[in-house]
Amino acid sequence: MSEAAIAKKAEEVKSVNAQLLAAESAIVVDYRGLTVEEVTDLRKQLRDANIKMSVIKNKILERAVEGTDYEDLKATFVGPTAVAFSDEDPIAPAKILKKFADDHDALEIKGGIIEKKVQTLDAINEYATMPGREDLLSMLASALQDPMRKIARAVKAVADKGDEEAA
């Protein structure tokens, strides 16, 4: 192999390593058996959520995780491998890929990283069923507003009762 090819592969390993270390989550999937239309649809769904999916050679991935906390992922680098990277919402890739895998038997989630930790397949599936960040924020806002509404109603009821007695 020429020095230029070796340098190119080393640069690719460095790039994948940087993506993995920067990502909030990276889910490893086997896409074997999906049609071109299905892969295009999956990529569109992921892109709409600001998630990048890349097909990466297993050897490149193995070298990219060497010496990191993600070495346990090496067991998932078998067969055709694609990785969905998210720098924002750590749960979004798991949710989208799980839903897609439920609808398309050919897609197999093999493992991944969520919130900078290697997760088991069971943990990834559990994360996928959790509400998203926006849903959780909305639930929190609602929970915080509810006591204030009750106090406002109580104060209004006392004020209305005072107005009735004064009349």
Curated annotation (Swiss-Prot):
Single GO MF annotation: large ribosomal subunit rRNA binding
Annotated PROSITE patterns: RIBOSOMAL_L10 (PS01109)
Assembly with partners or alone: Part of the ribosomal stalk of the 50S ribosomal subunit. The N-terminus interacts with L11 and the large rRNA to form the base of the stalk. The C-terminus forms an elongated spine to which L12 dimers bind in a sequential fashion forming a multimeric L10(L12)X complex.
Keywords: Ribonucleoprotein, Ribosomal protein, RNA-binding, rRNA-binding
Protein's organism: Limosilactobacillus fermentum (strain NBRC 3956 / LMG 18251) (Lactobacillus fermentum)
InterPro entries in UniProt: Ribosomal_uL10, Ribosomal_uL10-like_sf, Ribosomal_uL10_bac, Ribosomal_uL10_bac_type, Ribosomal_uL10_CS_bac
Protein family: Belongs to the universal ribosomal protein uL10 family.
Protein name in UniProt: Large ribosomal subunit protein uL10
One GO BP annotation of this record: translation
Entry-linked Pfam families: Ribosomal_L10
Function in brief: Forms part of the ribosomal stalk, playing a central role in the interaction of the ribosome with GTP-bound translation factors.
One Gene Ontology CC term in the entry: large ribosomal subunit
